[in-house]
Amino acid sequence: MKWDKLLNDKRRRESGVTRSKNTDVRSAFENDFQRIVMSASFRRLQDKTQVFPLEKSDFVRTRLTHSMEVSTIAKSMGNMVTHTIQEENLDQDFTKDHAEKIPEILACAGLLHDMGNPPFGHFGEESIREWFRDNLATITYKNKSLAEILTPQMKEDFYYFEGNAQVLRVVSKLHYLFDQYGLNLTFATLNAVIKYPVSSLKVNKKQIKSKKLGYFYADESLFNEITTATEALDNRHPLTYLLEVADDIAYLNADLEDGVKKGIVNITQILKGFEEVEEHNKVTAACYNELKKKSERYEGQEESFIVQQWLASNVRGQLINRSLEVFYENYDAIMAGTFNDSLIDASSAEQLVQILQSLSFTYIYQDKGIVESEIAGNEIISKLLETFIPAVIYYDSETPERQTAKDKRLLTLISDNYLGCYRKNAEGESETMKLYLRLLLVTDFICGMTDSYAKDLYQRLNGLS
């Protein structure tokens, strides 16, 4: 892979806005950034769960604040990487132009990376997957089950449903501004946000690039168009490795910080989590010792302040620097598409990551309030699927008379954007493809909801409010 192509600043459609060369000095990627920030899809992230579902506290993260943090960390890492590539002469073909583009692309990708997530966080994704696994074989169309009618790839798209794959749909199809191109972002930005460049038929948890579904069957031609333009093809875009680290760092730090602020975990428990690991490497030892020092130095201060200082000044720096060491050491393999690991997992910070993850799992993710909220979120999403999937089965079919009056009324609740996207993509397609697209219509609708809207709609449809 070559940076000239990987950083492709062309768009699927040339911008229809006339820009004055004298007054508009924005780069294509700065333009991407502004399009994202000003989009409704980005604003909706302020009412989508990060860890604490339906959380009303002003302090804890939502998907919006998380995405802003990922964007900031990713851009910072981009600046560090471009500096080192030039200083250490890691790539003779690397230019100043490349160095200017990379941080801008990463800033955009950080904002975008969670834009396809359904309500109620990652548990919402799992709720969608479980519902389809449980119900595709029981819902019928013309006396045949959907599991019999759909192709293997169509079925796997729902069994492996993934918010990251939904990002492509949101920004390139569903976010209708002027036409079918959505936000019409650059090829480089779109490719950087594709974490898993594989279809649902090629999911393989042993490979970093194929751990999860990367794009839906309905978006295969879009995926091919993007990766052909960047010449990444079926390889992971090098910037995706950096985006992944930024995401990991943001959630590892934020989950623990938010947990301390809410009183779910304290410094004594964090130190104990470190002490339960018998032999610390240098990275882990440094972070452990710093937390002990800070807790003694700032004794009497709020624990959330101490942990916040520790995470910002010690943990985050270790995670970034150790991950970037792996990027530099494996630069050629990354550019060749043969590096098969997460930067952070392959680094000397892996032990630290495992401790932080264990602390979050033990004290935060298992907290009674969070578990109760996740169960409520699962019930809401499952019930919405149970309501809307049957309603779309005979919409735009060869037997529309089989739609009930209730089905027709439910369809009026689905956004005209989503219905318009369905009609455009279904035009001239086979009956099976149309049926598949109608199922996607419902997941598009649900993924576009905020937590509050999903909860309110569920309550209204079930006579609870």
From Swiss-Prot:
GO terms for molecular function: dGTPase activity. PROSITE patterns: HD (PS51831). It comes from the Bacteria. Coiled coil: none annotated. GO terms for biological process: dGTP catabolic process. Keywords: Hydrolase. InterPro entries: dGTP_triP_hydro_central_sf, dGTP_triphosphohydrolase_C, dGTPase, dGTPase-like, dNTPase_3, HD/PDEase_dom, HD_domain. It holds the Pfam family HD. Residues 1-22 are annotated as: Disordered. Residues 63-252 form the HD domain. Belongs to the dGTPase family. Type 3 subfamily. This is Deoxyguanosinetriphosphate triphosphohydrolase-like protein. It comes from Listeria monocytogenes serovar 1/2a (strain ATCC BAA-679 / EGD-e).
